Amino acid sequence: IQINDSFFKENLDLYKYAQSDIDKNKAFNQCMTFIKTLDNVIEKNNGFILSKTLSLADYAIFPFIRQFVNVDQNKFKDTNQKNIEDWYSIIHESSEFKYIMKKPNLS
């Protein structure tokens, strides 16, 4: 979580708000350093960050990975990070995620 909240978050912001394609690609590549490490951790731990089941660590990091993926979904898919893709889908499609992302009825 510490690496996510420092190195990854800093580069994620640079990637999201880059002023040039060169800056955006550089920030993307920096983010991919963390993404590849996370992909390996997820593989090692059988599908999630700490173990075989969802934990607070997964929920803490997911919003940042979601932001990264949403900048350019096709570019992310081209990286072939299968473990992260599966992990992402499980959380994104979960009833918990859908519940917290439900827009409130303000009328």
Can you describe what each PLM-predicted range is?
Residues Q2-E93:
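GST-like fold's C-terminal all-alpha helical module
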Residues D72, M101-K102:
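Short, flexible helix/strand-to-coil boundary loops that buttress conserved ligand/catalytic motifs
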Residues N83, I100-M101:
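Extracellular ligand-binding/catalytic regions of CAZymes and related secreted enzymes
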Residues H92-S95, I100:
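Long, amphipathic alpha-helical surface segments
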Residues K103-S107:
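Long, charge-rich low-complexity segments
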